[in-house]
Amino acid sequence: MLIQKIKTYKWQALASLLMTGLMVASSLLQPRYLQEVLGALLTGKYEAIYSIGAWLIGVAVVGLVAGGLNVVLAAYIAQGVSSDLREDAFRKIQTFSYADIEQFNAGNLVVRMTNDINQIQNVVMMTFQILFRLPLLFIGSFILAVQTLPSLWWVIVLMVVLIFGLTAVMMGMMGPRFAKFQTLLERINAIAKENLRGVRVVKSFVQEKEQFAKFTEVSDELLGQNLYIGYAFSVVEPFMMLVGYGAVFLSIWLVAGMVQSDPSVVGSIASFVNYLSQIIFTIVMVGFLGNSVSRAMISMRRIREILDAEPAMTFKDIPDEELVGSLSFENVTFTYPMDKEPMLKDVSFTIEPGQMVGVVGATGAGKSTLAQLIPRLFDPQEGAIKIGGKDIREVSEGTLRKTVSIVLQRAILFSGTIADNLRQGKGNATLFEMERAANIAQASEFIHRMEKTFESPVEERGTNFSGGQKQRMSIARGIVSNPRILIFDDSTSALDAKSERLVQEALNKDLKGTTTIIIAQKISSVVHADKILVLNQGRLIGQGTYADLVANNAVYREIYETQK
């Protein structure tokens, strides 16, 4: 997959390889020219020194320029590949259902799209900057070193075997450690994210010490993994250098006697030592890159898990159509992923177009679950849900989204403007449509008090608005598309009694033909509904008007009595 991404930048990659070739040629020629300069100096051929020296400087300049261009090209390729991977991953995540998101965990996905892709980006960068250069430099330096002093070939082989052997052992040991490191990084990110989002709860219940202890436990474990990896490499790198410098010392000691009989051999020794140093450099860099490559391989596997994941739900690839606003549940049973007990059990009911229907029940009765099944955020394991007489699994996503709109209990706004947030409900919503939706949601008053009205900025998560204002904008977003079925999942809970009453009056007046489903904790929110559904422990145990249920349904009557 990574190779396919790099192919997108094939011309930059080819140019980078050309620059790599020039860099290697420069590195291999410089010791040879240095050898010739020393030879000319020792033999008194001073005229040759200038011409050879000019070539030496020219070759060095070519290598320097090629190196600079290669850095630019490598950065371009690495940034492009990481951007493409990040976009592919985000695009795939957009196809995930609620169940898929819960399986991966939101914090986990954030780490994969940031830290893991950064690891891959770094390795792609180093691949074009260094990795392609190493085998060419190693082979070229080995051949030229042996050619310069053939009798010392075994010194190079011994050094290479020792260093590569240790590197192979360390790579085998480090792989599991890097995987553990990534897992701990996910956990520490999840804890930090959870605490930052829930800072009010932490402060309210004086949980700072407990949360800090929880964070510290994972942080210490992460530190332990990092220290282990650091200690391991603190042993490996000095050992590599020790072997390398030992090889240099051994080479000089072995040829020391040759200098006395033939002083011109000094140039050969200098050239040999330079080539030996380049061999040491390549091996040390392989060890260094091994660390990064190990991390990147694990990161690549984690990105592939996202890209290769099969969404738990898919929509039919068929043309959009118009559906009427009737709704029916037929023997629906639903269990959340990872749960054993069903949240909804054999639920059946029918709602006619234009009806206002309330859904009540104790906490945990399955009210919000029922609401989330209608826009197909989850699929039931048994039974069928039909809108306009059609199973919602047999219609396109576009059809379902324009037919059903849901206002969630927790108002979530995105950074941008008020208009940007309302247009999430309908992408091409006009100012008139937004005004209408804001009026129904009782949001017009505070929006028009703002200098830029609908173009006023919304900060991340809507932190510059009160809870009630965010909830009213969330309601307006649900209304703006004028859906056939509108669901309120206890979404008026943040409103005061007056605002809630005004919203309900506006809904009755302006959305008369819309099928409205109100999930409510308070009986007063659904007292005027055409029909009320009563849920208890996942089962539908009653349905009827307010008066019928007060008279005939014990659970409803109990809720009513506690709220009088």
Language model features with spans:
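Helix-loop-helix
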Residues: 45-48, 58, 144-161, 228-302, ...
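Short intracellular "coupling" helices and adjacent cytoplasmic loop segments at the cytosolic face
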Residues: 43, 79, 87-111, 115-117, ...
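Transmembrane helix-loop-helix hairpins at lipid-water interfaces of multipass membrane proteins
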Residues: 7, 11-69, 73, 146-151, ...
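Hydrophobic alpha-helical transmembrane segments of ABC transporter permease domains
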Residues: 18, 26, 48, 66, ...
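Membrane-embedded alpha-helical segments of multi-pass transporters/permeases
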Residues: 28-32, 68, 72, 138, ...
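ABC-type nucleotide-binding domain
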Residues: 322-564
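An intracellular "coupling" helix at the cytosolic face of ABC transporter transmembrane type-1 domains
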Residues: 8-10, 95-99, 115-124, 128, ...
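A short amphipathic helical element positioned immediately N-terminal to and/or at the very start
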Residues: 1-8, 109
